[in-house]
Amino acid sequence: MKNNQFMVIKNNNHSKKVKISIKTAEELAHMDFPDREWLIKDLWREREHMMIYSPTGMGKSWFAWSIATAITGGGVIKEGLWENEKLEKVLLIDGEMDMEDLKERQELSIKATDADQESVYKNLQIISRQDQMMNLGFLNLGNKESQKSLINYVENEGIRVVILDNFSTLVDMPDENSASCMQPFQDFLLNMKQRE
């Protein structure tokens, strides 16, 4: 067994000695894991990340709203393919849309997914940049303080799914294509995933 070996880890130009869990191939082969629940059947399971990508205007936000209403209201995205039976709490964070547009998308998504409206109203929470007071700033998920605040909120509210719409408006970084610039956000995503 090689668990709990000390290694020097370099992170953001700082080195520190930390305990690292190391498994042999045999130990991994004998590990048992509980079944992960489907958030949306045959599409998305708990402890998984999903990123939706397409050119502008192809319906990414509509799809995100469909996922949110299906999970919170027991809806169906595609009959017989992507369905949800167990209701979960969802937090949708929107970085750019007008509140009136968000309201319209919510109502149309509830109808399109045949979700239970009262369940969606109870289980879906929305944080919108456009709903905030001017000049007070907004979440920057590239920033550790914003990340910590969001994680605390999610844990305190019992939220199972966080939907970020969209990356460019919620993560302030100099270069989205730079691996080093992405590292704080990647750390945040892994931190969220490990909290399950």
Give the ranges of each region predicted by the language model.
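Substrate-engagement module of ASCE P-loop NTPases
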Residues: 150-155, 182-196
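A generic secondary-structure micro-motif detector
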Residues: 30, 140, 178-179
